[in-house]
């Protein structure tokens, strides 16, 4: 008792870590038994104190940190500023996400750090504080959620949600916070369930690989070892200690000439401390890798047992212990993972702050401007940068390390504690980085524009992906887009104003086929509502006539061939009333009069100038067309019977002019040559008979089968079949048409239609007659083209004549085939161009024709010019809104076509929400054309401006009260990529003389009122030119700036502005006010500007822009794709798959890929240097040694990141099994092993020494599953998986199982060879001692060394082998 008074008393609280150290020291000093007695007393003391304390926990004990309020408020303020920057287009979505996460993460971390001091100051005996911070129950993160804030959560995919949960569990969550919280909780539940099963299966596979590894010998006699050195500084002291404790030395350790540790000595704590203190040379230790035993392990290579601290006992099943040691932490960690919504592993960067107020000075030549990862402007320094801070009385130098961001400018004044630089946190080795694609989607629809900072040529030839060389903004210009899938059908031209009743709005031009009445009523809806109240009433044709060519002329598909730069076809759509029987027939929207001009623009005499496809001469069935001719057969009267012989066609086959023709329908099937036909030739079938496996007949009749090269043509002729007698005259003829009532048959007297008689001969002697029905088409004038085209077009001008003819499209007796359900046009109504041949014009055989489209003040005129020498025919049609039409729909003018009178009432019509201006956009896809409609809701007006505080006179404002987009602009901003359209720009000028010059339009000099602005034609190259071709003034609109001047044209300017300029939000463009919305300037007027609303989107270098310039963007379309690096989540649920990938050697990540490349490279080089016999041996040894070290490090990295300590020995035993096999290659033939066979490395070495020829093999990394199926025991393999296959293979090969492992003995009910059952298996074999491989491996990082080092390390090996070969030869001699 007296001694106890002299003992030192430590009045200190003890946590879990300190308790571990105490127990470890107790075991070292007193042993296991006495330590257990001491710990029992500690336990009893703890229970007594806990009972006396009687801690209870209530909801009032959860105290919220007082500073939380202003911390959250500060974070919200930062988030609001960040949101504004994103809205302005200053930061993009990835930068916003990063910064938002970092703001809330730092707020949450600060709250977590404040927790402990707050409890200590306010309530040190708080039960929550006592329990959590003593380590008894609950960790810091759990308490932080109770009294701090829950913070950031992750969604089920593991992505961070940037909306943080600001409340804690004590305060309670709002509905939104509760739902977000459930996201993270659900992820935790799913991960726990799924990963626990994965961890269990991983444990099973690990145990399967190493279940036969048992300690069976004391020493295997190896002289090899792996070197570990504390000198390199890269290995922390803690890890160095963990690696060495419990190992056995492979070599003596010297300090100078003094030996401080001997070979085969086990290493304890004292010896490790001496190594660290003396900084000795690299230490060679024995590991399971170096053990020479093939299927077991020796005591010295394993080292100390972790249970009792002495060398492991013989017969201990260290393999099963190793498998469970690796698998069990995974199971435990998944069960006790507490999810706070994903661990934020990014960390915050370190900051350099100014020590006091002063001015910053640094060398600007050493820094480069850049953007930080949060989108802030900064300078990047590549080398060490010295920054000087000058104050009034002192100088202070700050060293900024390389690759840091400088956040201040040169000569800038900084305040004390201001952040001046950001140091990039060193890349943590435990965090895995991954590249992630982030797609930014459009939240509005409109038209895409970008600046010249984007490569306009796409990355690939036919792609729509553009790369950014530097940061720039994309703009989505507002407007309502509508898509048309038929290029040739566009009712509206560029710059038209439309109303909401138009077809573009109602149908959106998606429906390509509808009934004629529907089409007609949609066309005429705004115009004939008053006149036609009933749906079935046919419209007034005078109205239709008046508007058909005025409002609906549009270019056809071939006008979009941009290279030709000319329109060579126009279609004039119109409709007419069909009969009730054919009311439901569908017609394509492209019906109408097609005026087609050859590409070279030259017409020959009598050539077709325009044509129209009449729906009355349209059929859906296949068949034969027949015309009337004068030739007849002698046996029948002329008027009764017509026989058709071959008629020479006097025109091309599709331009026959006839008055009447006949159509004989038939069903035709074109089948592949390999088809199996279920009907015979000349057989008679009924309706819906199966012809092939997938085809049935639509009609009944006679089948005719014709086999051609690669196809079969099957025809079905419908009609009546007769077997006539010899007296029938008609039966002797075939291929004749019979008029109604003119046959000799009694049954045919009631027939009112024509018949077609065809003779069919199935055999030589038999025949029958098929009488087929005929459809007769009488070709009448139908709808006269003269009523559909303006009268002046058909009038003769000079010698030019236009005549209407009907032509049949198919030759006499030609077969017409319909594809699926498409209809066949039989007759085409054509307009033929001709001219009289006077004596003067006798040599004229050609006429030139062209379309001229002229737009002036929004009225578009088409001029059709047919030039015959000096004569010309002009057709003028004018299009605009319906009120501008005259009664007959036509306005003729003899004025100069490039001029139109300025009429205010016509131009200043009020906007309504359903009315807007159409802009036509022709993309690369010729099959799809898009519209964009701008209405007043998409634009806003700034102004009137004030100059020097003086407003403009009211008169000048009244003049232009309404905004008219139509008369003002085309595509703006950059180089135009649209062709074939004339655009109008207006110029604002304050020089009256210049205005007069511009307005000299041909012979109209100064007759027009001088206006403040005027419109000019613009060609496809984007050059504005005035129509007065005498004055050579060419203006480029993109270089012009307009000055806003006082109304009396004084010289003071207020603002300079460019048409087409993009303006960001809150940019001041006028005095005494802010500009509130972003957009593009589309109209610049004398006292105001009109800005089209636009939305900016920032894109940084390396980003990918989708879509072309000027393309229509719809809501939800992908705009930009960013690629950025993201830290992977660090919890064990993410780590387990990595462990599995390493152990299964899957080349999914860069882990195995790099390893495989290094292995292949070494195999090749070693063979070249050492030759084939020893190249394989040394190459395999080095490869296996390096890959083993790499695999152990990868697995340890995952577990250490979770704070789990697994001894390297356990992992080494597993890795030894998956790297101990080699693959016999096909390079050299061997009599023992087959190419592709897996054998053990030691077995390959022994066989190679025994044989005279070398065995060619290469190292292979087996996964744990493959290693389990490639063992020496087929019973063990069969009990793992693929039982039937393994047993059948073993039976066929006659394998023998020596029952050396645990599992096979358990399966067969024998005694397992471990523990007490081990003694029966102990045998000492001396034959292994003679097969020593004197191979030393002392350098851990072998693969980085030079080749001469490898030769140095393996000199003993080469010498011994060389001497052995010499000895063998001398014996043979």
From Swiss-Prot:
Documented EC number(s): 2.7.7.6
Record-linked CDD domains: RNAP_beta'_C (cd02655)
Extract the GO molecular function terms from the UniProt entry. DNA binding; DNA-directed RNA polymerase activity; zinc ion binding
Localization annotation: Plastid, Chloroplast
Which residues does the annotation say bind Zn(2+)? 220, 291, 298, 301
What cofactor does this one take? Zn(2+)
**Signal peptide annotation:** none
Q: Which family, according to UniProt?
A: Belongs to the RNA polymerase beta' chain family. RpoC2 subfamily.
Q: What is this protein called?
A: DNA-directed RNA polymerase subunit beta''
> What's the encoding gene here?
rpoC2
